[in-house]
Amino acid sequence: MPTITANNCEMHYEIDDYTDPWLKDKDTIWLQHGVGRSSKFWYHWIPAVARNYRVLRRDMRGHGLSADPGPNYTWSIDELLNDMRGFLDALGLDRVHYLGESIGGILGVAFAAKWPERLKSLTICSSPTAIRPSARTALSGGDRELGRELERLGGGGWVKILIEQKVISGKNPAHVEWVTNEWSKTPTHVLRGINRMLANADISPLLPQVKVPTLVLAPSRSPLTSLSDQLIIRNSIPNARMAVVEGPGHEIYVDEPEECISAFMKFLKMLP
């Protein structure tokens, strides 16, 4: 289980590479998970993607096997961006194709606006620009205060609300059990801290500043980001492309992996 220290944080990561062993010039794809998840959640993408690319998966700070910054840590977009840049620097990677899901996409937009020279392309999947009132309702399961609900339920209890609200996929009982167990591993103070950070975040002003080739994987029925919001993202990023994915909820990369992977791979092959 490889780890590397960047920006004063020990980060766990995985590299999957099933390309032909004699190839010397290999592009790297970075798959970044969302809140409460870990690098494990991309398991079903690896067979299709790692045959042609080196695939990098990183546990975000406080998630999976990466270090927990503790309950007094002040979460900020800037520090998470510094984590990302430090991670690339520590691995000696100059440029990657970046795909971020949900908050991973939010961070991807901000990273691309700040350090475009580090990305060959940007793909954002099911990513809002900001947490709207309707999204807050879905995240809390009603009109309840999210912080109190998280403190009361913990990650494992919260995930049940998210499945009911179609924020998280619940494909079958075995999948629900696995997802619940994985979410339970994320400390409650991490979930609360990130949600406080996102409550006031809005990356809309950064969209026109993104100058790297961009694909928007847009869910048609996400309770966290409407299709009209996804269109705004596509229209605000210069020359961005969009693929609308008809799924039951927010997690299209889980519910419709074949369609998402197909659109993603087609996008990469179109790049110069």
For the regions a language model picked out, list residue spans one by one.
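Short beta-strand/loop motif that positions the catalytic acidic residue
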Residues: 210, 216-218
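Gly/Ala-rich beta-loop-alpha elbow adjacent to hydrolase catalytic centers
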Residues: 100, 104, 108
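Flexible "cap/lid" loop of the alpha/beta hydrolase fold
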Residues: 109, 113-114, 119-152
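Acidic catalytic loop of the alpha/beta-hydrolase fold
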Residues: 221-225
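Conserved acidic catalytic loop of the alpha/beta-hydrolase fold
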Residues: 78-96
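Catalytic active-site module of serine/aspartate enzymes centered on a nucleophile-bearing elbow/loop
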Residues: 240-272
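Conserved alpha/beta-hydrolase catalytic His-Asp/Glu region
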Residues: 133-139, 151-208
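Conserved HGGG/HGGXW glycine-rich cap/lid loop of the alpha/beta-hydrolase fold
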Residues: 9-73
